[in-house]
């Protein structure tokens, strides 16, 4: 593969006007080292970088591109809407269709509010939970990332595992006062006993528990059914709001989201990524009595100039229609499992300590023995070995997430030929680590 000379020059240029040369930290390749690839275009399961090099894409814009890049029906829907202007700042029929679609696909959502980012969704859901309960304390879990709102930047996984000191139960970012995060209690992921103790001591103070039912921002870590069941029971018993952050898992692991896989009904759900089809879109919704506290009906304020943006809604509604096809998620899950099983077999043949797991169209690669079940176990992965593997795969034309602490994503366009090309690359790459 040729040297990414155009990406090198673009990165040098970008750093003059953009902090770190990127608009989201993980894109800078700081975790893995080297120069980030600047992308010129994408189609199906492929990216083309600024030098014209084609790459098999397992990032998928960090999850949204579940039907592949530039799907013709999604592109056509956006083009048709764009001809009538990009934004109105007023209600549209299309956003009603989006809301109806979300409520139909996710039974726990009785009403929904559209926003523009996952951070807005989680931030607003927590404000709503506090307004509804009249309480302040929020419970989150180590390694779960819920966006970059101040009160949630505590042991938050994702890029913060690369950029922050994770040994302290303190803000994971400069600029976040300790007075802000004092209302956030951080507990170990998958530890139901710790959650029971927290409720025993602080049950009357806890407004909400927020969780990724499948964590995707400390690599991929599944919640156990017992953990989520205990969480649901404790929230019900103590009058706290259970919030599932399904910004990443929503519609990617199942048509009914992770809550359908586990059979757990949250009070509020946060969505994003897939519901925008690659455009900036997110949402939060749930029980009607809770959602009724939102302005203009209630006293909990939330607003957004571009909320329900027509272009994003068009892309999202079309994507949701495509993935609602019979068998879509069964095929996606089977293909993703085929990918991780194949990679695990190749690593085993190469004698490399390695494990892999998948849920729906998400997957995790771990340079360690055994699939991790907690934040602590994830941080025991061999980051140096992952970094070497990442660069070896990139040199072979396979683009993985540039961090040992991020999940990967498969689209419906990753067919057997794409997987076999990935396996051929991996056979050579594992020899380099």
Swiss-Prot record:
Q: What GO MF terms are annotated?
A: glutamate-1-semialdehyde 2,1-aminomutase activity; pyridoxal phosphate binding; transaminase activity
Q: List the disulfide bonds.
A: none
Q: What is the first-listed, main subcellular location in coarse terms? A: cytoplasm
Q: What is its EC number?
A: 5.4.3.8
**Which GO CC annotations does the UniProt entry carry?**
cytoplasm
Its annotated pathway reads: Porphyrin-containing compound metabolism; protoporphyrin-IX biosynthesis; 5-aminolevulinate from L-glutamyl-tRNA(Glu): step 2/2
Q: Which reaction does it catalyse?
A: (S)-4-amino-5-oxopentanoate = 5-aminolevulinate
The modified positions for N6-(pyridoxal phosphate)lysine read 273
Q: What is this protein called?
A: Glutamate-1-semialdehyde 2,1-aminomutase
Which organism is the protein's source?
A: Ralstonia nicotianae (strain ATCC BAA-1114 / GMI1000) (Ralstonia solanacearum)
